[in-house]
């Protein structure tokens, strides 16, 4: 904007108002095309604010520094499941941590809604899934792959402590015969 404000009077004085509009009409689209690759790179390296805000609602992820949460949001994958569909099954290997974006998920009789995360036990304890998670309604989830999730959570002491608290509570509820918290 500043450069345009400086150049506009010079351009108008040199070639006139009409010709200036034609030049600007030709030059600006050409500049946009030339900078397109850099703009695409910027889009790929900037996390969506919605995904970042959703991840921040999960206590163990909220403890992470903002750049780490933004990186996780950039690497996250959006996944959908229809009502009644299993998302993860008890006994299978864990490969992702999930955060509910919309809809409802049921795990051992307990429901999880938007902003709730699940699947951390298998990833952080390196054990098979401890329960089946099923979509009660159509759900939109944000999925974090094992590697980035584990590295982020275990690499930051406050997040690791928050994760240990969640895991201990869920395993305690599971061993007591209750739904995980």
Q: Model features per residue range: what roles?
A:
Residues 2-24:
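Transmembrane alpha-helix termini and helix-breaking/packing motifs in multi-pass membrane transporters
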Residues 35, 139-148:
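A short hydrophobic beta-strand segment most commonly corresponding to one strand
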Residues 24, 122, 145, 153-156:
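Short, flexible helix/strand-to-coil boundary loops that buttress conserved ligand/catalytic motifs
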Residues 51-54, 68-69, 128-130, 147-181:
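A small-molecule sensor/coupling module
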Residues 26-48:
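Multi-pass alpha-helical transporter architecture, strongest
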Residues 53-131, 147:
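Regulatory nucleotide-sensing modules
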Residues 2, 16, 37, 103, ...:
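C-terminal structured domain segments across diverse proteins
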């Amino acid at each position: 904007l500043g450069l345009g404000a400086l150049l506009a009077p010079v351009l108008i004085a040199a070639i006139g108002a009409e010709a200036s509009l034609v030049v600007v009409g030709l030059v600006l689209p050409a500049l946009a095309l030339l900078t397109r690759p850099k703009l695409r790179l910027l889009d790929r390296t900037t996390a969506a604010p919605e995904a970042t805000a959703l991840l921040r609602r999960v206590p163990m992820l909220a403890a992470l520094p903002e750049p780490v949460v933004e990186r996780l949001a950039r690497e996250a994958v959006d996944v959908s499941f229809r009502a009644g569909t299993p998302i993860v099954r008890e006994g299978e290997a864990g490969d992702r941590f999930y955060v509910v974006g919309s809809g409802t998920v049921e795990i051992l009789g307990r429901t999880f809604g938007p902003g709730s995360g699940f699947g951390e036990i298998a990833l952080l304890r390196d054990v098979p899934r401890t329960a089946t998670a099923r979509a009660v309604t159509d759900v939109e989830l944000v999925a974090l792959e094992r590697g980035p999730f584990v590295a982020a959570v275990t690499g930051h002491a406050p997040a690791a402590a928050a994760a240990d608290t969640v895991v201990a509570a869920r395993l305690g509820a599971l061993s007591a015969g209750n739904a995980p918290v």
